[in-house]
């Protein structure tokens, strides 16, 4: 997620609203095309993740996990080299391709989690999974800080803006060495099952299968709406603070880093306690309200540090909502189906985020960034009213 979270502070002033001619990835294009391309460049990552994750997971179950992890890290290295070159020469299509490759390689996250579970005792599985969750939330605020540290916001040289991508490529190259030489060749439980036929449309078929179950469908509707709305908020808010508040790249990076810190503490401290005390369904409903109210408040109360405060509330809200829904999803199915259900939820998240990010480009093009944020607030609040009351299975 560090690689994903550096994108918004960089693309807002180079694609959505270029600050100068030298930092324009679509020179001489219309304002509408700039914003549509901005949404497409953001949205392609989670959409590729949606299609890749089930396929990569199936390959790892049927063959071995280590080769796929190596391929994913190598692919991530190449994707950031490609994005760096595209940013250096201000070329949109190669940048878009690099984003797509990054999304495809991120589909290995589930394989990494499976590898950890294969090689740890049963009583420590929850602990190891929590490590992956914390790592993801750390990436949310490390990415923007990484971009802010490496880019001079006053520079008009494209090479300066490409440095974070080359830096990330170097990080992945360093990671690749211990993965190749020190990661055990085969996890303990890999290859235990009979090989199954690879299904290239597994993600879509899993979604269709879950949609046939009434309770899963009832939960998935607000889950999709809120995550799509938040994707729209993420992309629109980067443009809005640049235009309306005059933020430069470094200030946009700080803005999103604050959200990442809020997400980190929400996952680690507040969410488990709130869910335990009030129940996942209540927490999910009211976290959607928190997102809507914080977004409206940001549009109205712009003084001083208040936008940063509302950004923190927004990220806390989406973190609470996501974790609560995951808890509900896992309680709607039997223990034997929970792994499948959580993979479906992850796919739903990727698809919803991708649609929201792409939609933000359309809204910014024809209405403005303000409209994208209003869209987020309205649909987050709407989700409160349609959130279902569900009967969960007993925990085993």
Report the location of each language-model feature.
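Short amphipathic helix-loop junctions that connect adjacent transmembrane helices
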Residues: 10-35, 235-251
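Cytoplasmic helix-loop-helix junction between adjacent transmembrane helices
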Residues: 98-136
């Amino acid at each position: 997620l560090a690689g994903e979270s550096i994108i918004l502070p960089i693309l807002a002033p180079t694609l959505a609203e270029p600050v100068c001619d030298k930092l324009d990835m679509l020179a001489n294009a219309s304002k509408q095309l700039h914003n549509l391309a901005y949404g497409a460049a953001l949205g392609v990552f989670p959409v590729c993740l949606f299609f890749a994750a089930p396929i990569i997971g199936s390959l790892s179950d049927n063959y071995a996990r280590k080769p796929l992890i190596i391929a994913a890290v190598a692919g991530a290295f190449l994707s950031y080299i490609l994005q760096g070159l595209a940013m250096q020469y201000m070329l949109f299509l190669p940048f878009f391709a690099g984003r797509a490759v990054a999304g495809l390689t991120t589909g290995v996250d589930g394989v990494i989690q499976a590898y950890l579970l294969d090689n740890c005792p049963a009583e420590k599985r929850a602990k190891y999974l929590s490590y992956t969750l914390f790592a993801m939330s750390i990436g949310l605020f490390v990415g923007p800080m990484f971009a802010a540290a490496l880019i001079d916001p006053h520079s008009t040289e494209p090479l300066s803006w490409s440095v974070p991508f080359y830096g990330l490529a170097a990080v992945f190259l360093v990671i690749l060495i211990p993965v190749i030489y020190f990661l055990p060749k085969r996890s303990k439980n890999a290859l235990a099952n009979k090989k199954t036929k690879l299904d290239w449309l597994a993600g879509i078929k899993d979604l269709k299968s879950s949609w046939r179950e009434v309770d899963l469908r009832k939960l998935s509707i607000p889950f999709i709406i809120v995550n799509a709305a938040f994707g729209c908020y993420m992309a629109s808010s980067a443009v809005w603070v640049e235009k309306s508040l005059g933020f430069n790249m470094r200030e946009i990076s700080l803005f999103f880093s604050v959200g990442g810190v809020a997400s980190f503490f929400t996952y680690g401290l507040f969410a488990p306690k709130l869910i335990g005390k009030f129940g996942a369904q209540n927490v999910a409903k009211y976290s959607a309200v928190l997102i809507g109210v914080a977004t409206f408040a940001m549009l109205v109360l712009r003084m001083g540090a208040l936008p940063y405060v509302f950004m923190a509330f927004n990220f806390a809200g989406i973190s609470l909502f996501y974790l609560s829904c995951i808890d509900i999803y896992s309680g709607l199915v039997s223990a034997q189906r929970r792994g499948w259900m959580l993979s479906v939820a992850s796919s739903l998240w990727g698809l919803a985020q991708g649609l929201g990010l792409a939609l933000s480009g359309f809204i910014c093009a024809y209405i403005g960034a303000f409209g994208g944020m209003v869209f987020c607030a309205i649909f987050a609040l709407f989700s409160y009213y349609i959130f279902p009351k569900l009967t969960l299975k007993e925990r085993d």
